[in-house]
UniProtKB/Swiss-Prot annotation:
Record-listed ATP binding positions: K34, G35, G36, V37, G38, K39, T40, T41, E243, N270
Signal peptide, first to last residue: none
GO molecular function: ATP binding; ATP hydrolysis activity; metal ion binding
Gene name of this polypeptide: GET3
Coiled coil: none
Function statement: ATPase required for the post-translational delivery of tail-anchored (TA) proteins to the endoplasmic reticulum. Recognizes and selectively binds the transmembrane domain of TA proteins in the cytosol. This complex then targets to the endoplasmic reticulum by membrane-bound receptors, where the tail-anchored protein is released for insertion. This process is regulated by ATP binding and hydrolysis. ATP binding drives the homodimer towards the closed dimer state, facilitating recognition of newly synthesized TA membrane proteins. ATP hydrolysis is required for insertion.
Subcellular location: Cytoplasm; Endoplasmic reticulum
Family under the similarity heading: Belongs to the arsA ATPase family.
Name of the protein: ATPase GET3
CDD domains listed in its UniProt record: ArsA (cd02035)
Enzyme class: hydrolase
Biological process, per Gene Ontology: tail-anchored membrane protein insertion into ER membrane
Lineage: Eukaryota, Fungi, Dikarya, Ascomycota, Pezizomycotina
EC nos: 3.6.-.-
Length: 325
């Protein structure tokens, strides 16, 4: 492909996501879209810019295929760690399957020792729940957010379908815990007497203690769920490329976000070509023509959105310096 069709890495195109940087009330920022459209690059760049204007920023990857470590060139894990070169930007990569294993390990072995067969049964049940990986990601996020104080949190999310389930999880879990609490009020005394006769729950807890912890979790989730639906506190940045499938996924995502009452008003269109008039690259010109068609559709569909057009660069966007541009 002719380099004349690309924009050098030093060039910067307007508009930007400046409105998000200026909105000082924002606490939760989600970045999502179809796989391979540049979500991680966008979320990393946004987090770096936020670190310039906010006291403390946490960047979290909830995608099982983590890319934050590759993007910044340093290793991240499930504990928040400062990004090299920053004193107010931290990052973490949540491993959902490992989180689930940790959760089950403590109670599972005790359950087996008691003869209930709880370990294997609970593990099979837990992993059969749709969206359980997003559920564990959310639980891990809550744990980190409660123990550490960050002014704004940026989520580098999984591909579209997983992201939407992740965002729906607070509502689903809140309803589920409320129903469980209702059932416990009706059948709690009877269950306590049965469990008491058989030695109680794993770890020596009784049902009331477990339900009390779950109620506390429900209250926390209810609070976060309310924040997710507050446009002053939460927004979702959609990332796409100027192709049919990506645009289709973006439209579906925006409709679902609207149904969840989650604010979204910014779209980043990545990998755009800008061939010069004297370019001899026919493939570049043809692709630019196709991209322009979908850019026109985006402009028509989302006239009230801040649409950010980003070029296809001549080099990989890796490392603090390139991400900062």
């Amino acid at each position: 492909m002719s380099s004349a069709a690309l924009v050098p890495a030093d060039d910067i195109l307007e508009p930007t996501l400046q409105s998000i940087l200026d909105q000082k009330s924002l606490r939760w920022i989600f970045v999502g879209g179809k796989g391979g459209v540049g979500k991680t690059t966008t979320s990393c760049s946004l987090a770096i810019q936020l670190a310039k204007v906010r006291k403390s920023v946490l960047l979290i990857s909830t995608d099982p295929a983590h890319n934050l470590s590759d993007a910044f060139g340093q290793k991240f894990g499930k504990e928040a760690r400062l990004v090299d070169g920053f004193d107010n930007l931290s990052a973490m990569e949540i491993d959902p399957s490992a989180s689930m294993q940790d959760l089950l390990a403590a109670g599972g072995e005790q359950g087996e020792d008691m003869g209930f067969g709880l370990g294997g049964m609970m593990q099979d049940l837990a992993f059969s729940i749709p969206g359980v990986d997003e559920a564990m990601s959310f639980a891990e996020v809550l744990k980190q957010v409660k123990s550490l104080s960050y002014e704004v949190i940026v989520f580098d999310t999984a591909p579209t379908g997983h992201t939407l389930r992740f965002l729906q999880f607070p509502t689903v879990l809140e309803k589920g815990l409320a129903k469980l609490s209702q059932l416990s009020n009706q059948f709690g005394p009877m269950l306590n007497s049965v469990l008491g006769a058989r030695g109680g729950l794993p770890g020596g807890q009784n049902l009331d203690e477990v339900l009390s912890k779950m109620e506390s979790l429900r209250e926390t989730i209810s609070e976060v769920n309310a924040q997710f639906k507050d446009a002053d506190l939460t927004t979702f940045v959609c990332v796409c490329i100027a192709e049919f499938l990506s645009l289709y996924e973006t439209e579906r995502m925006i409709q679902e976000l609207t149904s969840y009452q989650i604010d979204t008003h910014a779209i980043v269109v990545n990998q755009l070509l800008f061939p010069g008039k004297d370019s001899t690259c026919e493939q570049c010109k043809a692709r630019r023509k196709m991209q322009k068609k979908y850019l026109d559709e985006i402009a028509e569909l989302y006239e009230d959105f801040n649409v950010v057009r980003m070029p296809l660069l001549v080099e990989e966007v890796r490392g603090k310096e390139k991400l900062e541009r």
